[in-house]
Amino acid sequence: MFCCLGYEWLSGGCKTWHSAWVINTLADHRHRGTDFGGSPWLLIITVFLRSYKFAISLCTSYLCVSFLKTIFPSQNGHDGSTDVQQRARRSNCRRQEGIKIVLEDIFTLWRQVETKVRAKIRKMKVTTKVNRHDKINGKRKTAKEHLRKLSMKEREHGEKERQVSEAEENGKLDMKEIHTYMEMFQRAQALRRRAEDYYRCKITPSARKPLCNRVRMAAVEHRHSSGLPYWPYLTAETLKNRMGHQPPPPTQQHSIIDNSLSLKTPSECVLYPLPPSADDNLKTPPECLLTPLPPSALPSADDNLKTPAECLLYPLPPSADDNLKTPPECLLTPLPPSAPPSADDNLKTPPECVCSLPFHPQRMIISRN
């Protein structure tokens, strides 16, 4: 009883201060201290030993140790109560959080100050540089004007970059549109070519080239008359020269054989003479008269070019190219009598020559009406 009262009397005044000091000096590692013991040990010793002197010595030693702990505090010393540990733990966490917050504030403030100082130093350097440059040129400017001009240049540069980017985007859109139009045009061209090819497949060769037959006929006539080989430019020139006095196209009554023979046989000779009329001098050429001509020399190469080979009263000597160059005209054999001429014959048939053709099983006598 006395020991308990003495302990409370000795430790009552410093109880609050001791608790606060333990809370404030608690270390991060929170393990229990190595103190001598507590009130449960005293009760156990006094009950089991029942020794008065031993109990007094233990109480005295306990009080001395507790007093020494209060005078000489240790890093790990506390009374072992859970309340003190929890309060110390909370305070330590708060203190660490506070230290962390304070450090962050300090670093933030230091960065701000450093940024301001650097900006001020740069401003001073710019001012010094501008003043020196303007002093040479006889001008004085402040750093604010220089910074304003720099900001204006930056804005202009940004505006130019924006315009360039917009132009690039517009150009990309235009190129895409042009590419789309080109694809549409190419598709249309392909469809047109397919349609033309389909149409050409249905057209006959003669319908594709309307002058093909006429050009070929003119080329054959040119080759037969001049003896020259076939060339395209001669064909075109012959066609151009013969288009003026082109003979009328054959009627439907003529057969295929008539058309094939009409290419080789000229239409200058009539198979029978016409009776004389009042206008013979105007219509009848004086080449084919019924009176025989006096004999002349043999025809030469110049005679073929100058004198037309029409209505000769004597047969020509046979040659290898009679079928190509010499038409079978004006033979001496007389023709059988035919029907009397009519008024239409004078309009359609020129009274040029009286000719006779030898009878051949593969040929026919042709009269050009």
UniProtKB/Swiss-Prot annotation:
Provenance organism: Homo sapiens
Family: Belongs to the NPIP family.
Ranges for region Disordered: 151-170
InterPro entries listed in its UniProt record: NPIP, NPIP_N
The protein's name in its UniProt record: Nuclear pore complex-interacting protein family member A9
PANTHER family: NUCLEAR PORE COMPLEX INTERACTING PROTEIN (PTHR15438), NUCLEAR PORE COMPLEX-INTERACTING PROTEIN FAMILY MEMBER A2-RELATED (PTHR15438:SF5)
Pfam families listed in its UniProt record: NPIP
